[in-house]
């Protein structure tokens, strides 16, 4: 192999390594920020569920349309959260695999947040009723909540679910499906709490208060899912870029050995030519 070509390849891969290393560091910083935001949303969401739990003794499901479905048409709405960009390992593939294996497209419609999910669902023939991929993810909470709530209340869907990558740690995430409507209390169960559930004095009336608290809870669940998904995305990208950086270093090492070998062979051949020429001159 040509020595000049080898040098160009080594230089090119070294530049790629610098880029992947920088992307790895940037993703690590973004992941820590998103992780902190995800942690900070949990206490408020938990507090809302405590209020609902302690008020349930005075509230019947009939008090709020958010607590029960108006239809039994077996039609479901899925809010799918993916990423707009690639280079994040199997982050998006995990979402695609889950949808492909777990979701019946005939009885399902989708609200998507993320271009990758929008492209995949369109390719497999899923029906997308709203796509919020072009706006800032944090600004998409309110329109997603409004659209899904409106469709649920008019009886278009029996249930509404969230599908997203739940952030577990810096090296691990899991694709999960969470029920959004009808609302369920997932963080706190009555049998798990040792607190005495006192009756609240609810004013002006249980229906008005519970409706507003439930709406806040649903909106916070959407916001929490988006933040967790972003943390998982940055985590996956950080790991992908780390692997790319390590692979680039290994390739550079192997190419450097090959370059040294080629250069040594070239020097050896030149010496042989010189010796052969000297012997030829002396024999003549």
Where are these regions (language model features)?
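C-terminal beta-strand-loop-alpha-helix "lid" module of Rossmann-like NAD(P)-dependent dehydrogenases
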Residues: 1-284
């Amino acid at each position: 192999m040509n020595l000049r070509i080898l040098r160009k390849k080594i230089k090119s891969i070294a530049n790629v390594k610098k880029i992947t290393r920088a992307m790895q560091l940037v993703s690590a910083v973004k992941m820590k920020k998103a992780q902190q935001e995800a942690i900070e949303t949990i206490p408020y969401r938990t507090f809302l569920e405590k209020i609902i739990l302690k008020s349930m003794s005075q509230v019947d499901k009939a008090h709020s349309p958010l607590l029960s479905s108006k239809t039994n048409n077996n039609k479901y709405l899925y809010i799918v959260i993916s990423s707009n960009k690639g280079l994040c390992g199997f982050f998006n593939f995990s979402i695609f695999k889950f949808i492909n294996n777990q979701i019946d497209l005939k009885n399902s419609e989708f609200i998507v947040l993320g271009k990758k999910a929008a492209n995949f669902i369109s390719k497999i023939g899923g029906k997308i009723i709203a796509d919020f991929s072009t706006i800032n993810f944090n600004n998409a909470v309110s329109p997603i909540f409004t659209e899904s709530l409106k469709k649920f209340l008019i009886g278009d869907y029996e249930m509404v679910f969230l599908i997203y990558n739940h952030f577990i740690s810096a090296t691990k995430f899991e694709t999960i499906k969470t029920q959004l409507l009808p609302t369920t209390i997932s963080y706190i169960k009555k049998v798990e709490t040792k607190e005495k559930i006192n009756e609240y004095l609810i004013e002006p009336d249980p229906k008005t208060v519970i409706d507003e608290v439930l709406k806040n809870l649903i909106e916070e669940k959407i916001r929490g899912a988006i933040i967790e998904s972003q943390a998982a995305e940055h985590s996956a990208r950080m790991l992908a870029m780390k692997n790319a950086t390590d692979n680039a270093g290994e390739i550079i090492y192997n190419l450097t050995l090959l370059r040294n070998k080629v250069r040594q062979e070239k020097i050896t051949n030149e010496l042989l030519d010189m010796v052969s020429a000297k012997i030829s001159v002396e024999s003549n």
